[in-house]
Amino acid sequence: FLKTTIPANSQIKKETGASQLVNSAPPKELLDWVNDGGRLIVIGSAMKKFVDQKGFGLNAYESESAKKDAKKNLEKERLKERNRKYGERKRDKLKNSVYGSIVKVNLDNSHPLAFGYKEYYHNLKLEKTLYPLLSKGWNVGILKDPSSVVAGFMGYKIKKRIKNNLIFGVHDAKKGKVIYISDNILF
């Protein structure tokens, strides 16, 4: 992790591409630091490192049944792919792609993270990963349903998976907080 001690009242920001902080799973020292009052900000694809890691509050699936359903659907897709044609591979890839979609995010504008905004915010969605809502903490920005896609290209398979997904939120961890922002919010 880090060779220096970080005071508990500090903040660490982990952005997309900042892999030197966390290589695979977040180290125990990072969780200890957050639990002691630190604030960790995780942005974009960096969130993948925190999925299903104990103490960080970010899950890949809403429930065990949702996880089983996703695995069944993935297996069905793999079986269908056996019959696909080589010439259609690029077109097939588009079904699961996001190339910059403008989405309408519903906000809890009573939370400090969204203070001053209306009840919605338009976000540039660049990541195809969709996260379920946090079970502990605050779900401040939520992608409600497929009609939330306002403009741009989003593959139909990703679009149909949109159902109350986290865009940004805050996980309360003992004395500290982990702030998740799934895409760059500077749009």
Locations of regions flagged by a protein language model:
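Catalytic beta-strand/loop cores that center a nucleophilic Ser/Cys/Thr
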Residues: 81-187
